[in-house]
Swiss-Prot record:
InterPro entries: Aldolase_TIM (IPR013785), DapA-like (IPR002220), Schiff_base-form_aldolases_AS (IPR020625)
Source taxonomy: Archaea, Methanobacteriati, Methanobacteriota, Stenosarchaea group, Halobacteria
Assembly mode: Homotetramer.
A GO cellular component annotation in the UniProt record: cytoplasm
A GO MF term: 4-hydroxy-tetrahydrodipicolinate synthase activity
Gene Ontology BP terms: small molecule metabolic process
Domain of life: Archaea
Extent of the signal sequence: none
Protein name: Uncharacterized DapA-like lyase VNG_0444G
Active site per UniProt: T58 (charge relay system), Y121 (charge relay system), Y147 (proton donor), K175 (schiff-base intermediate with substrate)
Pfam families named in the record: DHDPS
Length: 304
């Protein structure tokens, strides 16, 4: 358990903390699912020292997968690294019915917890959001974590709604990607029973400063050793070294943002010797110029 870094929530049975990458979903050249390589990526980051894995987050391209493909991803990752670190599986969908189905499957194959993104496309009020999470929590016998990313879902959770969600017995934490530091700080202060996970590479060390126990980092998909080093420095009480690592994370994050949305992570993995295949359409990869620039950036940062 952490020494100087924030502790997980008192009501979190998994005690989630540390670095929890939102692992990638690998595809073959024709964009068909490559479950084996998906599992290999989870293995890669676990062997690098991360503290948990989160399949089927944004980096896992979950909205672009069929329901059966999503189930295969969770099974593959649990089979590969389950029992070594917590596996918290993304199960969110626009409908409560589909979310429950994904959650039931994840729990049945051994996922340690489920991550439920707020439903998207249709706007929801707080009452609907709370009922959604209640129904998911009632369907599975494992902890449930809220994934709060209003920039993608269009649905922001108020602090009042979060307070109502916290009354759900098995709701154990929040992965916050809102980048709203005042909201996050107030949420952490109000709910010591919940584990909070900082969900943006722009706010890893700052997230720890406001009380987040864990870090869900896209950069950790590419350079897990960098983000693990940041967390370990912080937990050892070496804030100066942790902030220096955060500065490097900022530079890596900027490099990964070259070109089309989310193309940088898989391209960087390929440059570092791990081929996760293409993004699934309509997402597209880097062109030759952007790939060359990314390669130069990573080399300058000592990652190649």
């Amino acid at each position: 358990m952490p020494t100087h870094a924030p502790a997980p929530g008192s009501g979190d049975p998994l005690g989630l903390h540390g670095v929890v990458p939102p692992v990638v979903t690998a595809f073959d050249a024709d964009e068909s699912l490559d479950a084996d390589t998906t599992a290999d990526h989870a293995r890669m980051v676990v062997d690098a020292g991360v503290h948990g894995v989160f399949p089927l987050g944004t980096n896992g391209e979950f909205p672009l997968l069929t329901p059966s493909e999503r189930d295969r991803v969770v099974t593959a990752v649990v089979d590969e690294v389950g029992g070594e670190v917590p596996v918290i599986a993304g199960v969110g969908a626009p409908s409560t019915r589909q979310t429950v189905a994904h959650a039931e499957h994840a729990a049945s194959v051994g996922a340690d917890g489920v991550v439920v993104v707020t439903p998207f496309y249709y706007p929801l009020d707080g009452t609907a959001a709370v009922e959604h999470y209640r129904r998911v929590a009632a369907a599975v016998d494992c902890p449930v974590y809220v994934y709060h990313i209003p920039s993608k879902t269009g649905n922001e959770l108020s602090l009042e709604t979060l307070a109502a969600l916290a009354e759900i017995d098995t709701l154990a934490g929040v992965k916050d990607s809102s980048k709203d530091v005042p909201w996050l700080g107030q949420a952490v202060d109000a709910h010591p029973e919940l584990t909070f996970l900082a969900g943006s590479d722009s706010l890893l060390a700052p997230g720890l400063d406001v009380g987040c126990a864990g870090l869900v980092s896209a950069v950790a998909n590419v350079a897990p050793e960098l983000v693990v080093g940041l967390y370990e420095a912080y937990d050892e009480g070496d804030r100066e070294r942790a902030r220096a690592r955060q500065s490097t994370v900022y530079e890596v994050r900027a490099a990964l943002k070259r070109g089309p949305y989310m193309a940088g992570v898989k391209a960087a993995l390929g440059l570092r010797g791990f081929d996760a295949g293409p993004l699934r359409s309509p997402l597209r990869g880097l062109d030759d110029d952007d790939r060359a620039a990314l390669e130069a950036d990573l080399a300058d940062l000592g990652l190649l």
